[in-house]
Amino acid sequence: MHTLEQLRAGELLGARHLKLAENLTVFPPEIFSLKETLEVLDLTGNQLSRLPDELAEFKKLRILFCSENRFTELPEVLGRCRLLTMVGFKANRIATVSAASLPAGLRWLILTDNVIERLPDELGQCAALQKLMLSGNRLTALPDTLANCHRLELLRIAANRLEALPEWLLGLPRLAWLAYAGNPFSDEKERQLGETAAAAEIPWQALTLGEQLGQGASGVIHSAVLRSDEGTQGVAVKLFKGAVTSDGLPRCEMAVSLAAGRHPNLIGVAGRVSDHPSGMPTLVMTLIDPGFVNLAGPPSLDSCTRDVYPTDLTFTPNALMAMVQGVAAAARHLHERGILHGDLYAHNLLHSLLHSVQEQGRVLLGDFGAASCYDGADRERAARLERLEVRAFGCLLEELLARCHPNDEALGALHSLAEECLLAAVLQRPSFAEIAARIDAVAATMVVEPVCA
């Protein structure tokens, strides 16, 4: 975080990154002292409602964040910023998005939690668009021209007013991460899914909260002790914030978490709390052994849609096999229940650091914030939706193979599988049932070895 005082004192001359949050109501003219060098400008958390036309004079500006301000329209000056590729205006009051406001090189657009009812057809001309985040608006339709965005990989359209999921969307060649829960077209299926969930009701007074374990967009997770007639046990408790997130609505996440059921490669759910003193939706989950850690970090500003791994992270072939077997099994389990995870990424996987043969490479898939449900009886549509997630698995498999040592001929079949999962023709990709069978066939040819590379 920087300050206006630093800017005025000349302490930030030549800066490439600037982050200001000082309850600003106007764009500080002092920022223009950086127009020759500034690449990333973050004005999140102010009271701004407009940007100056002179913003187009910034010669190197690539990334602009103006979330949590008071904009009612996406500023048209953005369209004149020739190097701008990433634009974030989450949680404003934006109702209008004009064609003129869209930068030619746009890769990543965040308009979550606004009041947008329609988008311009010209959005489909943004050929470089990879990531589009529109959850929590008032959209009743998407521009059909988005079918031209062949590089689009991640799409968030949850919590809108969409009456149907466009057919062209399911044919986008690179789309891998999709969230659409909380729309009229999915409401009935979500209600049915919630009714089938066999979840224990856990009294709030039976829980004693401990330390905070983590915090995400949708809620805060604490360790806790659960008391019952059988004794006490350690659990994890997620307290949902209740607001719309970049992925969707917390109520949808909670419903899917309960409906997902038990699986050895999913983070287990013990039940829900319906009597929280503040009415806060609360989920009680299995407490994960500290020997499990996140497999990767989320995408960076530069990687856009690809996770960031520790530079020294490597896996043995046996550890890799255990991981991809576990992920494929978990995804297949969800698809059999009509659930699309929507965020099948390494950063949502916990993997075991334990070196025992029983635990080597074991993974747990969590975070249902982007999950959606679908009707498995509609086989053609279900197959298309499922194979979007197959592409996400292909990206993950490709990333893991790149970090596997030794990466010998025994893994050749997995390289071929990754290529098939990434095919541009959606229905030519294998199903998770096929994927699981092929991975098992490779695993059967391998011998047990130490997990450390």
Q: Language-model features: where?
A:
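C-lobe/activation-segment region of protein kinase-like
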Residues: 364, 368-416
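Activation segment signature within eukaryotic-like protein kinase domains
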Residues: 323-324
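The feature captures the LRR N-terminal capping module
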Residues: 1-53, 57-110, 118-121, 176-217, ...
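Conserved short submotifs of the Hanks-type protein kinase catalytic core
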Residues: 278-292
